């Protein structure tokens, strides 16, 4: 903490200038020293917000500051209809009617509300399912709010956008958010196992893995139909249930090549080179998209995602080399370094967080709050405006953090644990000692010119 840095510096200065002497005389009592006599009790506390069954995503409809929805791993979505009075609806907003697999890293992983939710009632989920054949899939679906009750969804309204076979039960990504541009962003892992076992990284003409997709769920006229993909269902007119933004990185290359609708080029990709992007979020003030990407055995990393960015997996892991030798594919030649990475001595599985934009902890304004599932540490990352290394401070710890969110009513940080408990980050209850800002204010010296100490400083 910054407090300890100041205290240590002053203590070392005093020790460097003065050498203690033993004396048989009675020690003089000092009455001028203003250094605090107690250590700080901690800047932050954690208040229990509520208990659930492993929440992996929290979301609220746009412009609704007093409601919040909690996506449980099992496939249930719970709603707090009145945050101010802590009113939790007795019935779940939705229980996904299809089979939701929950082994490994599977489950209901993502939840996002359409920007026009108040008008159309649409919301979207990412969950893992299983076909009758036994194949496990990653599924993105759209549901609709019930017409009879604003705090219930229609379970029969599911429309599947894509339902992709996945051979492993880890590295699913699965977070979804609408960006400031109105498009849906989807995080995608490399399918699982180690060393990019299924060889999905740096591949843009295969399946939806190892990157981040951006799609248009409104199918605006300016955007284009995706290329044919067996795992993306079509409507009665042969159209996909989404379109591809015309400015996605691969679209111009595809169009220049003739625009073959049967091409295997996956135009949905917005960024690639991610191993297991576990939790991402937009900064509401800047629009930056922050992502925590889980490493393999050496580094955990934080990235700010940009259009066309290549984040290096599997030839990079954080700032160091990765397990494979690869050439970036066309359209994603720009390799983007992480904002920050850290070694296994600090943690083993990053959980991406959120940028703090609340009002009750002003010293955290603009800081990215994130954690590590393995070490239980919660950090604040303060970006450097000049682009040099950010400042990182551990601010608390939480057992097995799996997701972060903001309370829309006040901007507070909410932290989800694997156990199901959700905690709120608040100001510490202990009184913070007041530390003098200058040597004069310490009361340790009679004169700063001669550095003669006050009576009682040296026995």
Residue ranges and their predicted role:
Residues 33-51, 86-102, 143-167, 205-276, ...:
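Blade-edge beta-strand/turn elements of extracellular beta-propeller
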Residues 401-403:
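Repeated scaffold domains used in trafficking and secretory/extracellular systems
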Residues 16-22:
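C-terminal segment of classical bacterial N-terminal signal peptides
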Residues 193-207:
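Acidic/polar, solvent-exposed loop segments in beta-strand-rich repeat domains
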Residues 316-348, 450-458:
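Predominantly extracellular/luminal regions of secreted and cell-surface proteins
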Residues 8-16:
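Hydrophobic alpha-helical targeting segments used for export or membrane insertion
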Residues 1-9:
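Bacterial N-terminal signal peptides that target proteins for export
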Residues 26-195, 279-282, 287-298, 346-386, ...:
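Acidic, Gly/Ser/Thr-rich repeat motifs that build Ca2+-stabilized beta-propeller blades
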């Amino acid at each position: 903490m910054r407090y300890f840095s100041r205290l240590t510096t002053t203590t070392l200065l005093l020790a460097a200038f003065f050498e203690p002497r033993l004396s048989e005389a009675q020690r003089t009592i000092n009455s001028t020293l203003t250094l605090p006599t107690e250590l700080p009790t901690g800047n932050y506390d954690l208040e229990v917000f509520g208990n659930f069954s492993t929440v992996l995503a929290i979301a609220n409809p746009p412009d609704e500051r007093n409601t919040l929805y909690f996506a449980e791993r099992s496939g249930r979505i719970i709603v707090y209809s009145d945050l101010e009075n802590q009113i939790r609806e007795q019935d779940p907003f939705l229980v996904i009617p299809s089979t939701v697999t929950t082994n490994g890293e599977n489950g209901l992983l993502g939840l996002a509300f359409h920007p026009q939710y108040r008008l159309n009632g649409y919301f979207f989920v990412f969950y893992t399912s299983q076909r009758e054949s036994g194949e496990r899939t990653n599924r993105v679906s759209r549901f609709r709010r019930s017409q009879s009750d604003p705090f219930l969804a229609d379970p029969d309204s599911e429309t599947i956008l894509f339902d992709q076979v996945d051979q492993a039960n880890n590295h699913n990504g699965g977070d979804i958010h609408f960006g400031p541009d109105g498009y849906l962003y989807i995080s995608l892992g490399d399918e699982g196992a180690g060393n990019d076992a299924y060889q999905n990284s740096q591949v843009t003409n295969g399946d939806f893995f190892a990157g981040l997709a951006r799609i248009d769920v409104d199918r605006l006229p300016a955007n284009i139909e995706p290329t044919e993909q067996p795992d993306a269902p079509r409507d009665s007119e042969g159209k996909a249930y989404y379109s591809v933004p015309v400015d996605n990185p691969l679209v111009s290359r595809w169009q220049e090549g003739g625009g073959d609708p049967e091409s295997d080029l996956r135009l949905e990709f917005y960024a690639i080179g991610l191993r297991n992007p576990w939790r991402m979020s937009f900064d509401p003030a800047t629009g930056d998209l922050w992502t925590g990407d889980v490493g393999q055995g050496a580094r955990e990393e934080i990235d700010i995602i940009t259009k066309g960015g290549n984040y290096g997996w599997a030839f990079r892991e954080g700032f160091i080399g990765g397990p494979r030798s690869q050439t970036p594919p066309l359209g994603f030649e720009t390799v983007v370094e992480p904002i920050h990475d850290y070694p296994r001595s600090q943690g083993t599985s990053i959980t991406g967080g959120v940028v703090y934009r609340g009002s009750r902890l002003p010293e955290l304004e603009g800081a990215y709050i994130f954690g590590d599932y393995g070490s239980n540490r919660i950090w604040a990352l303060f970006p450097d405006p000049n682009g040099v290394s950010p400042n990182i401070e551990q601010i608390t710890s939480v057992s097995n953090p799996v997701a972060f969110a903001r309370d829309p009513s006040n901007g507070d940080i909410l932290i989800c644990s694997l156990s199901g408990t959700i905690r709120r980050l608040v100001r510490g209850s202990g009184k913070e000692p007041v530390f003098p800002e200058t040597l004069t204010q310490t009361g340790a010296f009679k004169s700063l010119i001669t550095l003669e100490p006050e009576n009682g400083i040296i026995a």
